[in-house]
Design a protein with these regions (language model features):
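Long, internal low-complexity/basic segments
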Residues: 30-75, 82, 87, 115, ...
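Active-site segment of extracytoplasmic enzymes that catalyze sulfate/phosphate-ester chemistry
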Residues: 35, 48-53, 87-174, 184, ...
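C-terminal cap/loop subdomain of S1 sulfatases and analogous C-terminal strand-loop tails that border
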Residues: 196-206, 363-387, 402-406, 410, ...
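Metal-dependent active-site segment of extracytoplasmic phospho-/sulfohydrolases and closely related
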Residues: 105, 297, 303, 332-370
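A long, amphipathic alpha-helix that forms part
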Residues: 38-41, 51, 275-292, 315-353, ...
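A short beta-strand-to-alpha-helix junction
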Residues: 72, 96-103, 120-124, 149-160, ...
Length: 566
């Protein structure tokens, strides 16, 4: 009897050892380290963890069923991020009518999927893109600021992006359009997990505001080839010259890139900017067709430069009642998105593709009202942590998995897409566990709908400064209490969408201490997981065909960075 038991125990031990070894080889150990989140997540997990665990079992079953029907493959991911579009500008015919223009294709897309009514982003371009790509608040990796010129810094290669994570699970990856995460080699998309990338090194400041056409229309003053009197000019390096900076480049994973469609001595113009936008639309379409032919799932990222524009040089004259230059270009972007959605239908991939369309931050109010956009539901715009700066339209579609024509009123942050997409791509085990991941897995929200979010809070940074905290419908404006915390203002965002009527006594009396502790817990995590600076390096190193004027611009930058006092 003892021999029998001993034999069974020995066999069990061998079986367990074999299973453990297999698990080690596959990197799928049941006791793998969990993700590290911010402190507030654990407050919610303590109270809701058992419910979430039950939900996860059902979600895993549904995702497994999808993969089985899809030939064992995870869904394709198509992410479209539109620049400087505030809340209420897309996806709704009534609000379109108020604005005096139409976005019929995005409106139809919104009806086919879920509207994320409380999508929060960062206040400007670069930080929102970093938050999506890394699942982390940009303050954690030094990428909270937005560079508009040659800068010599960018996203560090040590950051793990959603493209890298999905690549590990067999996804083909492509990026087309705006990037804006640095002008150094390690920061570029083809060095951050994308197999193919076509993108401008910089952003629309260079591409549509700094050039001669913009100076001719006085969108910019004091620059341009023939737009100022230079009799008193001593510092020839003072003025940014769009034509001397690198414009658009193309490349493949791990290799140098090449600047395209810009010859030595050529001036950058609004017409060339328009051609760049048309080219990116064509390349997005080409990549969609190419990726759809593969037997692997794909992650396609398309970040248009339009609707941002400056001069009316390439803008049809008032084809909408609104007539603003951004609005006229948004009409074009809507047309282009419609073409991409139609192509997905024709390729037969719509049902196995998760598509997200959203804005990156609020309106660029500096150019209001000529742009055609002004804040509507919320107050504030780009560069602000008022709701108008960080609340955007966001729509997500996955036929058969996400309920059509639905609305989620839960809080969600752009960083949550990182963690959620990783799970949908069966790649959660590729997310690093040696750093804080701010993004929360929101698969339950997408597949179960309204009230299933796993987040009821968001921390709002402006560059490196924590300026506001949102919890449920209440917002603490930390900026208003810089001199004295007692003076910090509370707002009820349901009753006061424009943050004009503080309820500091009514909410602060019971919630003030709770919010202070939230901030203390958040800051306390930084002792173990401190914020890091961005990567630095030689601007444009890794571009094989730098023009002579670009090489001179780099030398000017390097000299100014090493002058006394720097």
């Amino acid at each position: 009897m003892k021999d029998n038991v001993a034999h069974r125990i020995t066999g069990a031990v061998k079986l367990f050892t074999g299973l453990l070894a297999a698990s080690l080889l596959n990197g799928q150990i049941a006791t793998a380290k969990p993700l590290v989140h911010d402190a507030e997540y654990y407050v919610l997990e303590k109270q809701n963890g058992e419910t979430w665990a039950l939900e996860d079992k059902d979600l895993d079953k549904r995702l497994a069923e999808f993969r089985k029907k899809n030939g064992g493959r995870s869904p394709n991911i198509f992410y479209i991020l539109i620049d400087d579009i505030g809340f209420g500008d897309l996806g709704d015919e009534t609000l379109n009518a108020i604005r005096g223009y139409k976005t019929p294709n995005i409106n139809e897309f919104a009806r086919e999927g879920m509207r994320l009514a409380r999508m929060y982003t960062e206040p400007s371009c670069t930080p929102t893109r970093v938050a999506f790509m890394t699942g982390r608040h940009p303050v954690r990796n030094g990428m909270g600021n937005t560079a508009v010129d040659i800068s010599g810094f960018g996203l560090a290669e040590g950051e793990v992006t959603i493209a890298e994570i999905l690549s590990e699970k067999g996804y083909n990856t492509s990026h087309v359009g705006k990037w804006h995460m640095g002008d150094i080699r390690e920061a570029w998309p083809n060095m951050q997990g994308f197999d193919y990338a076509a993108f401008p090194i910089h952003q629309q400041g260079q591409l549509t505001i700094y050039h001669d056409d913009a100076a001719d229309e006085e969108i910019s003053i004091g620059i341009g080839k023939n737009n100022y009197d230079d009799r008193y000019t001593m510092d020839e390096w003072l003025r940014t010259d769009a034509s001397s900076m690198v414009t658009g480049v193309e490349g493949v994973r791990g290799e140098n890139v090449r600047e395209v469609y810009m010859d030595a001595g050529e001036r950058w113009t609004e017409a060339k900017y328009h051609e760049m936008n048309e080219r990116y639309q064509s390349q997005a379409m080409e990549q969609l067709r190419k990726l759809a032919k593969s037997n692997k799932p794909f992650f396609l990222q398309y970040w248009p430069l339009y609707p941002l524009t400056g001069p009316r040089t390439t803008t049809d004259q008032y084809t909408t009642p609104n007539g603003g230059v951004y609005v006229e270009k948004m009409k074009l972007v809507d047309k282009w998105i419609g073409e991409l959605m139609t192509e997905m239908d024709e390729l037969g991939i719509a049902d196995n593709t998760l598509v997200v369309i959203m804005g990156d931050n609020g309106h660029f109010t500096k150019y209001s009202p000529g742009s055609g956009y002004t804040p509507m539901v919320f107050r504030g715009g780009k560069g602000s942590t008022l709701e108008g700066g960080v609340r955007v339209d966001a729509f997500v579609r996955w036929p058969g998995m996400i309920e059509a024509d639905s609305v989620a009123g839960d809080i969600i942050h752009v960083s949550d897409l990182f963690t959620t997409i990783a799970r949908l791509g069966d790649a959660t085990d590729e997310i690093p566990t040696d750093r804080i991941i701010d993004g929360i897995d929101q698969t339950s929200l997408l597949l179960n709908g309204d009230t299933y979010s796993r987040r009821d809070y968001v921390f709002l940074y402006n560059i490196n400064n924590l300026e506001a905290v949102v919890k449920e419908q209440y917002k603490l404006d930390l900026a208003s209490g810089k001199e004295n915390a007692i003076l910090a203002k509370f707002y009820d965002l349901f009753r006061d969408t424009r943050e004009e009527w503080p309820v500091s006594t009514e909410v602060g009396a019971w919630g003030g201490a709770k919010f202070v502790r939230m901030v203390q817990r958040h800051m306390g995590r930084k002792a173990k997981y401190p914020d890091a600076p961005p990567a630095t390096g030689m601007p444009y190193a890794g571009i094989d065909n730098l023009r002579p004027e670009t090489q001179a611009a780099v030398q000017e930058f390097l000299y100014m960075m090493k002058t006394p006092g720097m």
